[in-house]
Amino acid sequence: VSIPARIIQTARNRDLPLRAKAAAASLRCLNPDFEYLFFDDAEVDAFVQKEFPQHRHVFDAFPYRIQKYDFFRYLAVFRLGGFYFDMDVFLASGLRELLRAACVFPFEELTANRYLRRRHGMDWEIGNYAFGAAPSHPFLEAVIQNCVRAQREPAWAEVMSEGIPRLLRSEFEVLNTTGPGLLTRTLAENPELAGDVTVLFPEDVCDQREWHQFGTLGVHEMEGSWRTAGSYLRRRFCNLWEDWALRRQLEDSRRRGKTRSLRASVQAGTAPVRA
């Protein structure tokens, strides 16, 4: 089973800013034979209601719009198959070489998340700004189930906040309930699914210039429009803490070398890891 030639994107409405239009144009121009599907908010609501009525109450219960968008992208690709892209992802070449895969996600960055590092021995995360999968792929099914669990069982998701100052935990809620943190945790806790997932690792995972890309095919511009509103000082403190926490972990990551393997990481995560 392979990924169908389909691109899925979503935004609040079709009145897109110029940068988003340019990003979408890069996808379509480089993949002219791919089906292109765009969903605005009303169409997202209609899709969830029609295709996943059993999850409608979960979708509605997420407090942040970005959580709804995250949940929708997993549902849409699970049902339809194809590639999802955020509106700030630009491609440099076409996607055809990835159609042979069953499920593909980008390496996002090295992580300072204590739960992933200590419980599973993983010092990196995958991203959800761009990914592809065949319809009904079991990894996406597991991701959807964990999104539901994170919404219904806050204590289950809360363990991902280990080591984060309580004042800042709301800033990381999205990441750990529907975003990259949840994705990576799902991968780490389901090693039987890892063999069917392709991760687009850079040549050097410790080189921050190679983070937030879609392999060698594209780049995520990291607009971060989903970030919760708050005071400048709060956002600044959050960014400073995140940078400090990551710097503390980079030395350990550099000792591991510049390359990573999904199989090796997941296998390592099945063994006890020292704190």
Q: Where are the regions a protein language model picked out?
A:
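Small-residue hinge/turn detector
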Residues: 70-82
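Glycosyltransferase-associated regions of secretory-pathway enzymes
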Residues: 1-69, 85-275
